[in-house]
Amino acid sequence: MKSIVIFGGAGFVGKHLIRRLAKCGYKIIVPYQKSTSEEKLRLLGSAGQIIPFYFKNLKDKRIKTILKQTNVCINLKTSWSSKKTSFNQTIFEFNEELLNILKKNVLLKQVIFFSGLGVDEDKKSLRSVAIHKSENFISSNFKNSIIIRPGIILGGGDQFLSLLLPIFKVSYFIPLFGNGRSKLQPVFIDDVSLLVEKIVKNNLVGNHIFEAVGPNILSYRELYYLISKFMDKKRVFIPLPMKIAKALVGIAEIFPFSPINLEQLSLFERDNVKKEVDKDFNYLKITPQDSIGIIRKTVKN
C-alpha cells in the first residue's frame, strides 16, 4: 500500500484530496499543528486508513520517522498572515527543512507542492516571494517534484465564495476593490483533486509545473454580477480605490477577526490567470469543468 503524507490536510483542499486518494486505497498520514477534529478526518477513509496526528514542528521525532518512510509527500500548508512570524519563516523555511528531511528517504517517489498562479511574477507580495523561493528550492533539490499552481479554487465550502456570499445576502451595496477589471480563472476542487490522483497513480516522474485553472476567465465585476444574478438579487457594486481599501483593511487587521487581510486584498490588484507556459489539465487528459456552472451550483445551494 502506497503511503502518502499530506501537510495541510485538515483544510478545504486537503479534505477533498484525502477523500479521493483514500478511494484509491492509499494509507494517508495527516500531520497538523492547529486544532482540528481527528475523528472527522478519519471518517474520510476506511478504518485505520487515515492517520491524523499533532506535531509541534519538523524536529518532532515521530514526524521525522514518518517522513523517512513515506512514498509521496504533498504540502498544502501555507500562511496568509505574518503577524506572528514572517512569510519567509512559515513558508520558505518550513519547505526548506521539510525537503532536507525528505532527501534522506530512499522510498520517496514524489513531492507535490501547492503554490499559486503568478507567484513567479508578483514581487510586491512577501508571501508570493516566499512561495516562489520554495518552488525553486524544491525543484532544485528533488528530481521528482510537481508544483501545482491553482487558480482560485471553487466548490462547496471553498474559502472564496464562503467569504463573498454572506455579504451578497445581507448588503445591497457591494464593495468592488479597485476597478473590478482584474481577471481570475477559477477552478473546481474536484478537478484539482483528480489532477493529484492522476499524478500519484501514474507515478509521474521528473520536475513539472501545472497551472490548474478552469475554462472561464472572468473579471471581478463579471463574477460579482453572476453571483447577484444566480441569487436573484439586485446589487449595486461600489468601486473602492485600492489606496482606500488598503487603509481600511490595514485598520481591520489590528483586530483578531478581520474578514480579509492585505495579502488577500493584493489578489484583487492583478490578473490571476494562466500564462500558457506551463503544463495544464490537458497533459493528464483532464477536461476541467465549467466554472460558471460551479458558481451557479454553489450560490443556489
Model-derived features: where do they sit?
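Substrate-positioning beta->alpha
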Residues: 159-161, 178-201, 208
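Conserved catalytic-site region of short-chain dehydrogenase/reductase
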Residues: 82, 117-129, 153-158
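Mid/C-terminal beta-alpha module of Rossmann-like enzyme folds, strongest
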Residues: 198-261, 274-301
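Conserved glycine-rich Rossmann-like NAD(P)H-binding loop of the short-chain dehydrogenase/reductase
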Residues: 26-34
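NAD(P)H-binding glycine-rich loop region in Rossmannoid oxidoreductase-like domains
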Residues: 35-40, 44-97, 101-103, 117-121
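N-terminal Rossmann NAD(P)H-binding glycine-rich loop of SDR-like oxidoreductase domains
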Residues: 4-26
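Conserved beta-loop-beta element that borders a ligand/cofactor-binding pocket
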Residues: 136-166, 170
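SDR active-site strand-loop-helix element
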Residues: 7, 31, 73-77, 111-117, ...
